[in-house]
């Protein structure tokens, strides 16, 4: 083992946070220092030259002050027996840099803790420090650097074992059931005993684990398929049968329902843009459908929030890629329901400490780490996350604590699939059965069974085993392979594909072949495996992530292998399909057969469950709101996380990657997160796309579970109504059902809710639910001081509505317009004046639930509402729109005011006499902004179908206050700024806790600046002029290399921008250059694209750069290219970071900075204002002096120059091309106007001759106007950033 000391690992503010956390438990620890250590293992000694290269590879990141270690050592390394994603990526980089002997690189952090007087730490002090410096699920703490050797332990393979039921009978299997955490029901134990006794042999542990996973509640949805007896009466339908009823009645435009990894909905002819067989990008017109899927990953997120949420997102992404015979994930959504946060120093009056078991994370920890995990996975994979929800609930109801100690972690999204690939093909006997993606690793074992149990019912070690770890960069590589396959059209080598999820390949391979009506033979030792010490059971059933299984014809294997080799994606042929419907797994190492059984035994019909349950009546007190003060109510409600500003959850997630996003969460010139709907685009030459929106009203279930289901659907519809949809029948719903099955009364309430949705409301609305998921163990049980405790979730239906949208430009937002003359606000009150407060945010912040819930009494009114909004939008008569939901009418109107930075004058007299109920009820409805001149006509039109439900409630005001009257009586007045600060305080507190507190404070204080003009555009060129037109007309299209490395994800939108500007864009992978397949001499220019090359290990872009600098062929290629006189290049984001590290071989780039971690120490996805500076850059010719918004998405964008002199020389030589400015146009280092803190706002540079330029923001994601989150009225099809690409075409001539 080679040990190499690295740089300081933690910034001062991170160290301070740890020391502050120790003040209560270990105040004597007054000093802490952390530094990286790297450990390398090789199969032969490294030469001196190789050792020098290794040292340079492992020198990365920002400059931070280092110190001599002092104090007691705590070495934090990955848990022995695991391989971290960092390790696999860093090892790849070393090998690509020519150090082939490297077997593994790993990284640890050495913490040195000291007391003021230098005395040794006590055991209690050590115990207090350890949980603050490591994640016990993924890391371990040791006391010596030599302990890192434990990471590289090669064990002999563990043997197969059997369970002796032939002599031990049922008792033997029951003991194994408990010991292995199989979660088998008594009926399933009997079923297995019967079948194996019939076979005359004992089952292997491999077969039992495989059976348990394949037949777990998680995988087989036993409760949803069960027979039901309620209050002694047998029910005619199962829960799933009632859901299927919606599709049976309204199957229109649904291509696949309930039969694949995602549901497929009919699309239309679309021009898709991708690289063709020769590598050149082009448009291909084909029939393209969209697919929809929403999953949950609740149990793993409770145990290890970052990893659990990350792999939840990753698993759902795989579902979208493994549909049909290969598909493309496109855009995502994320949601969280947790118990109360208890933010330190920000305790809220409705929060009470009900305790929690030690084994699970607190709600606060889940909301600090979980969203980061989900966002990090989406970001690195390259899927924009553009919708979500966040709910907290922990309250006493009917003598019980109801809440989300077991959280909901929702992950979903949309994708696209070619019509020709929508169905899985037959698998002929002899076809190769392939595992694509990462290796088997001992993680996630038994996750399917574990997630089917109540939290706390499993043993702690098994809970640890059932959590997975994610490597999104590897999943990206696997998706690139899938993309190359489906892009071959009819020559797609993939016959059928499944993702590997719960149960690992022991579930995925049987599903793959069983669905095709064939069997299979496998060789266990051909499974790609990096932990040779695993037992056969562990190899077959582990839930290592980033894996797919697929069938490929033998004759297509060479083509498939060629694609995988180019994408550097591991794959293994593990078996072949057989005519006999039998599953056989052989093990050549031990010479035995761990699995040999008919598929009908594994996946046949184990005994069907019967649920015999009772209704339970609960006495619920009314919510007494008679003494509530409206000002206090506003302050409380606006701080409730379900209502409050969710910026801290949104800006950590990339929302612009792909260039296919028309509407994300952030709205208007001030980027306020209040959008009702997410909208994507179908391509780069269309305005058609997909819309999706979430509905969720779980607290109502504590009063009336069926009402909560109806209201969730209603909310999804009132949200998605903000997009332009041709017909309500085009809506397709995903239903995610969470329930504490077995809790008194809850099963019957679940049945009633499914019936209300599946048999009544959806049929009345004419819409269907073709996809969904259930999680039936939403209860946490534990013991505390010998007292049994429990926190039980309410029945929770999360509905996601999806639909094709006819024109993404017609999406309405809540931003009130104050620049379009005299306007009015209309409320459409679908509650028809009932003003019920049960289950509301208001009730919750006063510690109550109430006993009367809002409901959907009239499906026709909901349909009329939807149709009316669509008609008015189509006709251009609506200026703003926002649905009424959490926080009631009050939250609706103040959010609209926040987005428009305006005051309001409202009169609520027509809505009822009870001002509290009027303002805070959460009945369905929406507020519309219309022109005053249109008011009478629109009101009359709405009244024809919504009689008595339409109210004029006021108008935007020229002052800065929110003023609400009831006729002549003033009932509420407060400044918009004060309310906005209250609404944003929760997000500020979370950012302050999680990120750099200085940045959090700057963003929060931005709200105080009433002169902030917001995003704007000041252009010094004609946006409508196409300066490349003459050159395009000549017919000449220069060749442009669209360069990517493994983990890059922004290449397609970059190619589209250069294609539009008159280039022929070619897909060039670094593997093409290193292998000699492609040479840069054949291209006029190249662009290095954005993403996460090598997952940003060894510094963002640095691994990519070093694989060029230390690979002789690559270095020669790039050096020759840069030294040509006619070449040019652009580096954006990750490509910018990479090229900045090549400055030694780029003429004129000597003063370029190094790009390091953002000052916030967080990934920042923002719309930022930039100014183009006067420079020699060919890309910015004629643009100097322009100011305009641009997409930003990076974690390491701080421009770190060698020294102040180098920065000054770069500026003096006019090498700085772009800088961040604030909303008044001044260069800035203030967050978030400058999202990374770069000195003087510097974010783009060029060389002395202007041919090579680098920039951190993303012009390729916003070259069309429709791609902008906000833009001025009047821009046409092209946005201003297309000028950059056209300048490059003009440069060539």
From Swiss-Prot:
Keyword Ligase listed: yes
Binding positions (ATP): 308-319, 675, 885
Ranges of residues in domain Glutamine amidotransferase type-1: 1040-1293
Catalytic activity: N(2)-formyl-N(1)-(5-phospho-beta-D-ribosyl)glycinamide + L-glutamine + ATP + H2O = 2-formamido-N(1)-(5-O-phospho-beta-D-ribosyl)acetamidine + L-glutamate + ADP + phosphate + H(+)
Principal place of residence: cytoplasm
SMART domains cross-referenced by the UniProt entry: GATase_5 (SM01211)
GO function terms (MF aspect): ATP binding; metal ion binding; phosphoribosylformylglycinamidine synthase activity
InterPro entries attached to this UniProt entry: Class_I_gatase-like, FGAR-AT_N, FGAR-AT_PurM_N-like, PurL_large, PurL_linker, PurM-like_C_dom, PurM-like_C_sf, PurM-like_N_sf
Binding residues annotated for Mg(2+), in chain numbering: 676, 715, 719, 883
Pathway: Purine metabolism; IMP biosynthesis via de novo pathway; 5-amino-1-(5-phospho-D-ribosyl)imidazole from N(2)-formyl-N(1)-(5-phospho-D-ribosyl)glycinamide: step 1/2
Top EC category: ligase
Keyword Metal-binding: yes
Function: Phosphoribosylformylglycinamidine synthase involved in the purines biosynthetic pathway. Catalyzes the ATP-dependent conversion of formylglycinamide ribonucleotide (FGAR) and glutamine to yield formylglycinamidine ribonucleotide (FGAM) and glutamate.
Family: In the N-terminal section; belongs to the FGAMS family.
Self-association and partners: Monomer.
Protein name, as recorded: Phosphoribosylformylglycinamidine synthase
Species per Swiss-Prot/TrEMBL record: Methylobacillus flagellatus (strain ATCC 51484 / DSM 6875 / VKM B-1610 / KT)
Lineage, opening ranks: Bacteria, Pseudomonadati, Pseudomonadota, Betaproteobacteria, Nitrosomonadales
């Amino acid at each position: 083992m080679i040990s190499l000391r690295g740089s300081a690992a933690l910034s001062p503010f991170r160290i301070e946070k740890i020391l502050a956390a120790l003040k209560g438990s270990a105040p004597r620890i007054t000093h802490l220092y952390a530094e990286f250590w790297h450990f390398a293992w090789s199969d032969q000694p490294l030469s001196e030259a190789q050792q020098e290269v290794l040292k340079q590879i492992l020198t990365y990141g920002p400059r931070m002050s280092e110190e001599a270690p002092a104090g007691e050592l705590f070495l934090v390394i990955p848990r022995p027996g695991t391989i971290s994603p960092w390790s696999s990526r860093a090892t790849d980089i070393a090998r690509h840099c020519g150090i082939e002997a490297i077997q593994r690189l790993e990284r640890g952090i050495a913490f040195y803790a000291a007391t003021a007087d230098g005395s040794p730490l006590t055991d209690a002090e050590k115990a207090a420090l350890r949980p603050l410096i490591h994640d016990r699920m993924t890391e371990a703490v040791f006391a010596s650097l030599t302990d890192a050797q434990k990471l590289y332990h090669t064990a002999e393979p563990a043997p197969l074992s059997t369970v002796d039921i032939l002599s031990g009978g049922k008792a033997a299997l029951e003991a194994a059931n408990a010991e292995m955490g199989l979660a088998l029901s008594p009926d399933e134990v009997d079923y297995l005993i019967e079948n194996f006794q019939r076979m005359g042999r004992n089952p292997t542990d491999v077969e039992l684990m495989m059976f348990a996973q394949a037949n777990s509640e998680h995988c087989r949805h036993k409760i949803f398929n069960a027979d039901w007896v309620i209050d002694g009466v047998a029910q005619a339908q199962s829960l799933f049968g009632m859901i299927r009823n919606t599709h049976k009645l309204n199957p229109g435009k649904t291509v696949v329902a309930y039969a694949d990894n995602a549901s497929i909905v009919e699309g239309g002819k679309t021009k898709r843009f991708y690289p063709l067989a020769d590598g050149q990008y082009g448009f291909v017109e084909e029939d393209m459908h969209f697919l929809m899927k929403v999953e949950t990953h609740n149990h793993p997120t409770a145990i290890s929030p970052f990893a659990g949420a990350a792999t939840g997102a990753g698993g759902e992404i795989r579902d979208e890629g493994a549909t049909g015979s290969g598909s493309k994930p496109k855009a995502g959504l994320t949601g969280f329901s947790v118990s109360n946060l208890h933010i330190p120093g920000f305790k809220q009056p409705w929060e009470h400490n009900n305790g929690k078991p030690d084994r699970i994370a607190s709600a606060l920890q889940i909301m600090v780490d979980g969203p980061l995990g989900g966002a990090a996975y989406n970001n690195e994979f390259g899927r924009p996350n553009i919708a979500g929800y966040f709910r907290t609930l922990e309250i006493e109801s009917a003598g019980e604590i109801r809440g989300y100690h077991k959280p909901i972690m929702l992950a979903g999204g949309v994708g696209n699939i070619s019509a020709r690939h929508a169905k899985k093909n037959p698998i002929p006997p002899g076809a190769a059965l392939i595992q694509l993606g990462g290796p088997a690793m001992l993680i996630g074992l038994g996750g399917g069974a574990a997630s089917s149990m109540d939290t706390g019912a499993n043993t702690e070690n098994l809970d640890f085993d059932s959590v997975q770890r994610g490597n999104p960069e590897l999943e990206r590589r696997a998706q690139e392979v899938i993309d190359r396959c489906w892009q071959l059209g009819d020559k797609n080598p993939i016959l059928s594909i499944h993702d590997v999820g719960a149960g690992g390949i022991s579930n995925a391979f049987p599903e793959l072949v069983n669905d095709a009506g064939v069997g299979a033979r496998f060789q266990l030792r051909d499974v790609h495996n990096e932990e040779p010490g695993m037992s056969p059971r562990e190899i077959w059933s582990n839930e290592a992530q980033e894996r797919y299984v697929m069938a490929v014809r033998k004759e297509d294997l060479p083509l498939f292998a060629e694609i995988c080799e180019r994408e550097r994606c591991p794959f293994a042929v593990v078996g072949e399909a057989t005519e006999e419907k039998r599953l056989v797994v052989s093990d050549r190492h031990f010479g035995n057969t761990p699995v040999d059984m008919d598929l009908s035994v594994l996946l046949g019909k184990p005994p069907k469950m019967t649920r015999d349950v009772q209704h339970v009546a609960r006495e619920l007190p009314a919510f007494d709101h008679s003494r509530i003060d409206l000002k206090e109510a506003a302050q409380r409600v606006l701080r409730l996380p379900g209502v409050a500003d969710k910026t801290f959850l949104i800006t950590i997630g990339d929302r612009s990657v792909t260039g296919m996003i028309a509407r994300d969460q952030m709205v208007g010139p001030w980027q306020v997160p209040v959008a009702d709907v997410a909208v994507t685009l179908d391509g780069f030459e269309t305005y058609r796309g997909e819309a999706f929106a979430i509905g969720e009203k779980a607290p109502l279930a504590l009063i009336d579970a069926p009402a909560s289901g109806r209201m969730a659907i209603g909310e999804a519809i009132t949200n998605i109504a903000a997009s332009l949809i041709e017909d309500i029948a085009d809506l397709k719903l995903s239903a995610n059902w969470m329930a504490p099955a077995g809790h008194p009364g809850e099963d019957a309430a679940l049945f009633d809710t499914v019936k209300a949705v599946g048999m009544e409301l959806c049929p009345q609305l004419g819409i269907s639910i073709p996809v969904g998921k259930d999680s039936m163990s939403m209860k946490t049980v534990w013991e505390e001081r010998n007292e049994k405790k429990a926190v039980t979730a309410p029945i929770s239906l999360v509905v996601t509505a999806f639909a094709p949208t006819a024109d993404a430009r017609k999406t309405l937002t809540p931003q009130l317009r104050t620049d379009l003359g005299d306007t009015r606000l209309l409320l459409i009150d679908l509650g028809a004046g009932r003003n019920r407060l049960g289950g509301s945010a208001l009730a919750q912040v006063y510690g109550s639930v109430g006993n009367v819930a809002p409901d959907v009494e009239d499906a026709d009114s909901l349909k009329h509402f939807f149709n009316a909004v669509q008609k008015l939008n189509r006709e251009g008569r609506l200026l703003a729109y926002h649905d009424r939901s959490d926080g009631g009418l009050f939250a609706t109107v103040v959010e609209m005011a926040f987005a428009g930075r305006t005051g309001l004058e409202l009169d609520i007299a027509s809505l009822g006499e009870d001002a509290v109920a009027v303002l805070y009820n959460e009945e369905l409805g929406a507020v519309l902004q219309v022109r005053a001149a249109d008011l009478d006509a629109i009101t009359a039109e709405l009244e024809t179908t919504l009689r008595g439900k339409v109210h004029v409630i006021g108008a935007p005001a020229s002052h800065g206050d929110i003023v609400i009257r009831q006729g002549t009586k003033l009932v509420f007045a407060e400044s918009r700024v004060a309310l906005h600060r209250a609404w944003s305080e929760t997000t500020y507190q979370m950012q302050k806790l999680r990120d750099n507190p200085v940045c959090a404070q700057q963003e929060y204080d931005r709200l105080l600046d009433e002169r902030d003009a917001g995003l704007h555009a000041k252009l010094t060129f004609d946006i409508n002029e196409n300066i490349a037109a003459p050159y395009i007309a000549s017919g000449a299209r220069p060749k442009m290399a669209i360069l990517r490395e493994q983990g890059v994800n922004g290449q397609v939108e970059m190619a589209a921008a250069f294609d539009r500007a008159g280039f022929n864009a070619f897909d060039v992978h670094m593997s093409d250059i290193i292998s000699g397949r492609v040479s840069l001499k054949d291209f006029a220019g190249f662009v290095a694209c954005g993403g996460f090359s090598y997952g940003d290990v060894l510094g963002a872009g640095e691994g990519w750069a070093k694989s060029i600098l230390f690979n002789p062929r690559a270095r020669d290629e790039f050096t020759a290219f840069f030294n040509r006189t006619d070449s040019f290049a652009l580096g954006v984001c990750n490509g910018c970071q990479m090229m900045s590290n090549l400055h030694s071989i780029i003429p004129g780039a000597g003063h370029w900075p190094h790009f390091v971690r953002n000052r916030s120490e967080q990934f920042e996805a923002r719309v930022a204002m930039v100014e183009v500076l006067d420079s020699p850059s060919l890309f910015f010719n004629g643009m100097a002096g322009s100011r305009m918004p641009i997409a930003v998405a990076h974690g390491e964008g701080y421009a770190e120059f060698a020294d102040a002199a180098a920065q000054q020389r770069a500026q003096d030589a006019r090498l700085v091309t772009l800088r961040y400015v604030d909303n008044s146009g001044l260069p800035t280092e203030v967050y978030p106007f400058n999202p990374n803190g770069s000195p003087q706002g510097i974010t783009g540079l060029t060389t002395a001759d202007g041919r090579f330029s680098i920039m951190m923001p993303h012009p390729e994601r916003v070259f069309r106007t429709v791609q902008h989150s906000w833009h001025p009225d009047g821009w046409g099809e092209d946005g201003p950033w297309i000028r950059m690409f056209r300048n490059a075409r003009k440069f060539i001539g």
